[in-house]
């Protein structure tokens, strides 16, 4: 007769959770940031709000974003005029879009990750799906399982309404699943569509306007597993530790509420200050056990909430400009895609490291940090170890 302890030991993997593949996807519709203010005020019938339009132009100019991708085209918005008003009942129309498009875009990213992984999708044992775009039952995890043709026995977990920190959350969860289930291969998908938050401008709520200047659509997928099969699976990053914390005195700094008018977004001005003031504590807790205290000696993947957050973090920690290069590159090319952002940055970093002939997937460095920031304020801190590049 076997003991519970023997069963438990047999269930555990030996090595650390490892990112084995990454895939990303965006809608076809690309929006140029320089012309977006004119388009946005025209499509929302707000061109008479000239002062507010000038403010919005300045927001877009300061965003450090060149382009974004959005499922919402002019044609779709003209068919759904309530979505173009500031506070018109429009949840049904938004839901009709996101319940279809969130899994569909997630499928596109997942297929790319599965192709890079090079293994049959029947080997996927777990699915973690995350979106802040709408809710449904059965969820986007179920829809994706059907779209991809995954096994009916795949163990699914659906995360709705988490916000921008959740790219770190899904890696933390994937780490626990992979390391506690020998042979597990976890498909992680973050898929975000701004159809749930798009709305016209209002001079009484500039925080909503900030969201309209920053947010874009995108989906990213990673496959995570422990003990990679040598010669068959190619490791990209090891997930070493993962932690979550609530920042002190930050209640109400970022929040969102699902209403008849869609998902409303609220942001306090001191968010960059709250994050930069507290970030070193999270870093020390993560890296003290490793004997690392030089923040320029690690590679950086930070959720790019907006340029002000990145600038203040950089200044507070004395980071060299190149430390946030991959982060700023993704912000520039895609905007803020909520939970998907950090996975896009992970992809950008491993690709640029290989392209530039660096010795590891982490810009030639061994250790790195992935940060997610979002409603709460919640901070996810994930310590990564890079993999040598041949």
From Swiss-Prot:
Listed EC numbers: 2.3.1.74
GO terms, molecular function: naringenin-chalcone synthase activity
GO biological process, any: flavonoid biosynthetic process
UniProt xrefs under Gene3D superfamilies: 3.40.47.10
Catalytic activity: (E)-4-coumaroyl-CoA + 3 malonyl-CoA + 3 H(+) = 2',4,4',6'-tetrahydroxychalcone + 3 CO2 + 4 CoA
InterPro entries: Chalcone/stilbene_synt_C, Chalcone/stilbene_synt_N, Chalcone/stilbene_synthase_AS, Polyketide_synthase_type-III, Thiolase-like
Keyword match Transmembrane: no
Entry annotation: catalytic residues: 164
UniProt-recorded name of the protein: Chalcone synthase
Function field: The primary product of this enzyme is 4,2',4',6'-tetrahydroxychalcone (also termed naringenin-chalcone or chalcone) which can under specific conditions spontaneously isomerize into naringenin.
Pfam families: Chal_sti_synt_C, Chal_sti_synt_N
Enzyme class (EC, first level): transferase
Family: Belongs to the thiolase-like superfamily. Chalcone/stilbene synthases family.
Involved pathway(s): Secondary metabolite biosynthesis; flavonoid biosynthesis
Keyword list, A-Z: Acyltransferase, Flavonoid biosynthesis, Transferase
């Amino acid at each position: 007769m076997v003991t519970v302890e023997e069963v438990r030991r047999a269930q555990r993997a030996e090595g650390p959770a490892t990112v084995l593949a990454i895939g990303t996807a965006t809608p076809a519709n690309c929006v140029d940031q320089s012309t977006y203010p004119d388009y946005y005020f025209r499509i929302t019938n707000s061109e008479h709000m000239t002062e507010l339009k000038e403010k919005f132009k300045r927001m877009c100019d300061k965003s450090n974003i060149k382009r974004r991708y959005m499922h919402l085209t002019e044609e779709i918005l003209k068919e759904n005029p309530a979505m173009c008003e500031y506070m018109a009942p429009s949840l049904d129309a938004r839901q009709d879009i996101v319940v279809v498009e969130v899994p569909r875009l997630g499928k596109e990213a997942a297929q790319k990750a599965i192709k890079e992984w090079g293994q049959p999708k029947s080997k996927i044992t777990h699915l973690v799906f995350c979106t802040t775009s709408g809710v449904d039952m059965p969820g986007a995890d179920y829809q994706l399982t059907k779209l991809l043709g995954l096994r009916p026995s795949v163990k699914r977990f659906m995360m709705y309404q988490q916000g921008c920190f959740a790219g770190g959350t899904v890696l933390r969860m994937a780490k626990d699943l992979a390391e506690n289930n020998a042979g597990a291969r976890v498909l992680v998908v973050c898929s975000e569509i701004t159809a749930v938050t798009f709305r016209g401008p209002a001079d009484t709520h500039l925080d909503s306007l900030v969201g309209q200047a920053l947010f874009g659509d995108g989906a990213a997928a990673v496959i995570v597993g422990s003990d990679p099969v040598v010669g068959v699976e190619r490791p990209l990053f090891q997930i070493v530790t993962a932690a979550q914390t609530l920042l002190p005195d930050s209640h109400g700094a970022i929040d969102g509420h699902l209403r008849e008018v869609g998902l409303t977004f609220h942001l306090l001005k001191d968010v960059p200050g709250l994050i930069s003031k507290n970030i070193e504590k999270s870093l020390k807790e993560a890296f003290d056990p490793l004997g690392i205290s030089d923040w320029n000696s690690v590679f950086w993947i930070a959720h790019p909430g907006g340029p002000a957050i990145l600038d203040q973090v950089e200044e507070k920690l004395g980071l060299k400009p190149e430390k946030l290069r991959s982060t700023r590159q993704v912000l520039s090319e895609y905007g803020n895609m909520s939970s998907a952002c950090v996975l896009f940055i992970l992809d950008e970093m491993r690709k640029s490291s290989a392209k530039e002939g660096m010795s590891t997937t982490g810009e030639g460095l061994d250790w790195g940090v992935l940060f997610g920031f979002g409603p709460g304020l919640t901070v996810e801190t994930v310590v990564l170890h890079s993999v040598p590049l041949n």
